Amino acid sequence: MNRLKIGVLGAGHLGKIHLRCIQQANERFDLVGFFDADTANAAKIAGELNIKAFDSAESLIEAVEVIDIVTPTIHHFSLAKAAILRGRHVFIEKPLTHTVAEAEELLALTRQQGVKVQVGHVERFNPAFLSLGDISINPMFVEGHRLATFNPRGTDVSVILDLMIHDIDLVLHLVNSEVKDIHASGVAVISASPDIANARIEFENGCVANLTASRMSLKQMRKIRFFQRDAYLSLDFLEKNAQIIRLLDKNTEGGDLMEMDTARGKKWIDITMPEPLAVNAIQLELETFASSIVHNTTPKVTIEDGYRALKVAHQIIEVIGDTTLS
């Protein structure tokens, strides 16, 4: 595979992780350098990781084929637009942009320029999600909890754009239906925007997703559960594992399955815990993006996916605007 010349915009906490992952993926990428607006931090990272620090975002964009944007969300649009207009492929952290209008403009530019854009909805690459493999997922009810302890980093956006958007993306990816209605509420505890929020997303096909996100928790939790006809799937993104419980019409597994009577007749309960893949989710999403560029295939998480998740997130924020307690 051809090594792609890549540069990273932003060298904060997550940007530094991206730099390390790209260094590890040296068969896919040639890490040309990075830019960070904090010159003192840039000098420190350059020395620590032995990477060239560029003097401007523009000079870095000119020097590479691929740009990885890991800056605060408010800068996503201007940087991505500059890179796309120069014909560069772009990996951009979630959320895609600060506003829906910005996302729509980037979407149009991407199609116009014919470049690849992938959005960093990293849970698609979490070992827990990957372990489901080819299992058919057709959920009719989804319950998600994404709880984090308070950290000032990330409070530039609401908890919906910071945390809940991960689960919004997963739900939109798996539920093959349009959103019908949204009910939501939230509480601003410390930040200017909600620090805890709950959203009930109703789909045209009858599926309901009940999502809770908080950055005011005493303990971490990143779990989502899918309920569908004859199956229940539980994913723990923090522990990186999954549990699958299925109701089978016949004991075809040949094992000692529990038998039970249901409203639809006799069933057998099959409980499976797939072996999770030993992968680094961030490194895998970047390597997968490289593959889509080299082989001219559709990115795993498209700009359209990022736009849909952002649009629903902002709909939730609008609903909460009428109900927020602060």
Model features per residue range: what roles?
Residues 168-243, 276-295:
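Contiguous beta-strand/loop segments that form the cofactor/metal-binding neighborhood of enzyme cores
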Residues 122, 230-300, 326:
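C-terminal glycine/acidic-rich active-site capping loop/insertion
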Residues 1-48, 171:
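N-terminal Rossmann-like dinucleotide-binding module
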Residues 51, 86-88, 113-116, 207:
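A short helix->loop->beta-strand "cap" motif at the edges of active sites that frequently abuts
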Residues 59, 66-69, 288-326:
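C-terminal helix-rich "cap/oligomerization" subdomain common to oxidoreductases
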Residues 120-127, 150-179, 194-195, 306:
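Mid-domain beta-loop-alpha active-site segment that forms a flexible
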Residues 97-154:
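A contiguous active-site-proximal alpha/beta segment in oxidoreductase catalytic domains
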Residues 18, 49-107:
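Beta-loop-alpha module in the N-terminal Rossmann-like domain of NAD(P)-dependent dehydrogenases
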